[in-house]
Amino acid sequence: PEDRVEEVENRLLERGWFRTQIDPYEDRYYRVWMHEIPPLRHQERGTEIDIHHRLLPRTSRLSSDPAPLFAAARPLGDPRLHVLAPADMVLHSLVHLFLEGDPDEGLRLRDLVDVHDLLCHFAQEPGFWAALVPRARELGFERPLCYGLHHAQDLFATPIPPAVLQALADAAPRWPIRQVMNYLIHHALLPGHPDHPYRWASLSRWLLYVRSHWLRMPPGLLTRHLAQKAWLRFRGYRKRIDLAQLDLKQQ
């Protein structure tokens, strides 16, 4: 929960994790508007950890109330540890697949493969399919679910009950938008090749990236944010500096 983020962050800092140095604007942007805090890195292993307190930024046009997710989370062997419920795991994957605001972490084929695997795995659990669409409606994620099921079935022949697809029929966009989105998603999912780049794939990824930002923030805030980011790039400020590497250079 969000009210425990500071406690979790401090405990990690006490146990070998450190904050990566970023521009003060970026740090404030994370902590005030986003669904996570800036990533932490382990001083020995070099691994990064993201601490999330909700699925989407506070400013997102889609509902992002995390309370239902925590309420339905399932305990693991250690009662202090929980994982999302099956339907919520699928929706979490789809939300980040279709609404990711980082151009390096956007639509990737491997992430849709993950969705396919989740659907096939949880299909064996009684009540999973019956709960999936109602849960998406409750959380406001019908559209990402609609796109995800369509493309998983189209690319991987994921076995999805017809009743589930029928229940999502009213969540699909109108025909022109549906055709454009299907085209963009299909091309954005194509694996990139450094020697033979496919320009339509790059354009599709960029357009979906713009769309994700449009959905993440109201226009006024988005304009200010993009202007600030452009100014930081103009100044030549590096997005992230590894403090461990700086320490090595100083020795």
Where are these regions (language model features)?
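Conserved NTP-donor binding/palm subdomain of two-metal-ion nucleotidyltransferases/polymerases, i.e.
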Residues: 2-251
